[in-house]
Amino acid sequence: FFATSIQADGWIPNITIGGNNGDEDYTAYGATFLFTPNDRFEALLTVESMDDQSALKAYNQNFNVAPGVIAPPPPGPNTTDFSGGLLACTIYPQACRTSPDQLGYAENDTQHDASVKTDAITLNMSYELNDNLTVKYIFGYRDVTEDRIYDYDGSAAPFITLERWNVYDQTSHEIQLNGSYNNVEFTAGLYMFEKEFEQDWATG
């Protein structure tokens, strides 16, 4: 049996909604079972579950800069000049970034909530046919559900948010024939992989 738990407060203060960005809340647990009825056969089964409710650590910086924050680029045919500031600062001047320095705080007005849950099953079975040949079967299953929201612009202004809901199922089967004869070793087999993915994204 194994288990892991990680709990931590956020690491960067948020001056718009309070608290800190980047808190961690992760738990995982599982068990492994070994079955060896004789010297030729072995089965190893692992069942585990992971639950990650940690907030997203990305998109912590506001890049809606005011006029004069970014210097004009050198002359050239493929340059973009942001020295006049961004349009967002005209609409929401209170949400403008006024310094090019790395900020010691976050300004996003939407908390970066996230949830990722994973259930997993792995099975390995092997049987020795003789001293030279071994048959092996490997099974894997993953069930993942994900829900997260980003404050994409990272500012105090009510601009772009992106919310994602994903559901992912994966199943795999593998059969191997492993051989070893003097100086020759080989592996032959079949592999099947099946997955199903559902995605629902919304912007606001």
Question: Where does each model-flagged region fall?
Answer:
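Flexible loop and strand-edge segments within Gram-negative outer membrane beta-barrel domains
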Residues: 42-102, 107-116, 158-166, 195-204
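Short, structured coil/loop segments at alpha-helix boundaries
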Residues: 35-40, 80, 130, 137
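Generic recognition of flexible, low-complexity loop/linker segments
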Residues: 110-111, 122-124
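Transmembrane beta-barrel wall of Gram-negative outer-membrane proteins
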Residues: 1-12, 16-75, 117-123, 169, ...
